[in-house]
Amino acid sequence: MALLQIAEPGQSPQPHQRRLAVGIDLGTTNSLVAALRSGRSEPLPDAQGNVILPSAVRYLANGVEVGLGAREAAPSDPLNSILSVKRLMGRGLADVKQLGEQLPYRFVGGESHMPFIDTVQGPKSPVEVSADILKVLRQRAEDTLGGELVGAVITVPAYFDDAQRQATKDAAKLAGLNVLRLLNEPTAAAVAYGLDQHAEGVVAIFDLGGGTFDISILRLTAGVFEVLATGGDTALGGDDFDHAIAGWIIEQAGLSADLDPATQRLLLQTACAAKEALTDSEAVSVQHGAWQGELTRGAFEAMIEPMIARSLKACRRAVRDSGIELEEVGAVVMVGGSTRVPRVREAVGSLFGRTPLTSIDPDQVVAIGAAIQADTLAGNRREGGELLLLDVIPLSLGLETMGGLMEKVIPRNTTIPVARAQEFTTYKDGQSAMMIHVLQGERELISDCRSLARFELRGIPAMVAGAAKIRVTFQVDADGLLSVAARELGSGVESSIQVKPSYGLTDGEIARMLKDSFEHAGADKHARQLREHQVDAERLLEAVQGALDADGERLLSDDEREAIAFQMQELRDLLTGTDGAAIEQQTKRLSQVTDAFAARRLDSTVKAALAGRNLNEIEE
């Protein structure tokens, strides 16, 4: 008789057999894959012992080269050697063109305005390029671990929007990887340090990589990692340091700013080498072609000081959003290769009043944390129990209401996964459909927010305005992807959409949106109040006009009609202005002057309904 095999839900039925899962840091400059081995999370090396894989892909006529060889070939073959592709993930062709000379590629348009890079193998999308990097990491992991992977946790910047996250998942799928979860990079770093040092309290994760900057404020308590607030800049990183040095070389050497792609690549490689050398040296000799000069650490720090200031400003904002004081931050974790720059560490330490933590390699810490989470999600139970991660959404999500107003359904910094619902109603009598316009942002008017998607709810039963009840539910999953559903409660008609925008935010747009929301808070509040008063007034004017057309001649005297018409015109005149208080007062006056008319209409309706019926019929 066979025994029934029993296992904990989500756990392996054979505890001694580990399910192979990895953490992947898909970075702008470099990528890594890590896994738990002998109880310790560590990056996995390639056959030559290198753990870091340059995020570079070169397309050849008869093959694909990924990693160091592709990066080294970039100066001689810039059009087919794709670097920093992470900056293109989830972006539109128009967004990519704004990056200009920073991207020496030939771009062609594709479906849904997605940018394709023209290579010797034909057009390649950023998703395909990223997939080629992930394929190498997957193969490395399976070769090292000796088996097939059940899945991977892939890290993304906390500020990646829906389009960028979806593009990352699409790349993983194309690479043959099962995505267990997308994990914010700062949260992954917290996982690594929290387990290694059993830290509790408030921690700041300062993540300055090759192409993006993220700051996260987390509270660590008894194995729970809660992200209190996030901030950052999608267009700030070590690449920008390189471009600053490259600009200095162009100026010092008297070069033309209009360089061919090969020269651009060579110049950026020279700049990157100088930046890395200045980590340990006070000065470095720089040579480009026939020109040679000396770059001091002080001069380099002066170049990047505005960029560092931008990062510190984002840190202060994140601390404010988290509702704590700078002094409450008990530890600062440095993540990303660009945090090796001495001036960066010095500035961050000065801001938070403590020496930043760098005991885990800043290039490896994200992958190490992702591997720990992957091992848990794969069903391998670890000592110390489960780990709970509470990420947050970076920008508020909501929908458009009458008057072009943004109604926030899920506020920014809400812990995910999350589901929130609100009820709305119809604006006009007999309205049978409703357009649901999903938005992202912090401002009060939809013109100042980002449109994510639109869909229609049809089949709403004919009712008077305000009678229908439409419940709109927003749901954000653990990967930060949004789905929206609308349901009319009386009839049960329903419509939904999964938000997968065809392109992401432009460089710095998220940071700009947050900045604008703070700077324009007062004006936005006034604008919202004005639009609300205007909508109320327009609704009343429409209702009164409809009543006059139907029953005005029958139920009102000439003087009464004139009085109502006068108040209506007064209100229409005010609607062309910006005095919200005056509009509100005139709306009240029009409502008061039509009260008697409304009562007569009600009486008339009741009499008509009762005409020809006796008491017994009514009681029945």
Curated annotation (Swiss-Prot):
Gene3D superfamilies: 1.20.1270.10, 3.30.420.40, Actin, Chain A, domain 4, Substrate Binding Domain Of DNAk, Chain A, domain 1. This is Chaperone protein HscA homolog. PANTHER family: HEAT SHOCK PROTEIN 70KDA. Belongs to the heat shock protein 70 family. The keyword Chaperone applies. It comes from the Bacteria. It comes from Pseudomonas entomophila (strain L48). CDD domains: ASKHA_NBD_HSP70_HscA. The lineage of its organism: Bacteria, Pseudomonadati, Pseudomonadota, Gammaproteobacteria, Pseudomonadales. Pfam families: HSP70. One of its GO terms (molecular function) is unfolded protein binding. SUPFAM superfamilies: Actin-like ATPase domain, Heat shock protein 70kD (HSP70), C-terminal subdomain, Heat shock protein 70kD (HSP70), peptide-binding domain. Chaperone involved in the maturation of iron-sulfur cluster-containing proteins. Has a low intrinsic ATPase activity which is markedly stimulated by HscB. GO terms for biological process: iron-sulfur cluster assembly. The keyword Coiled coil does not apply. Keywords: ATP-binding, Chaperone, Nucleotide-binding, Stress response.
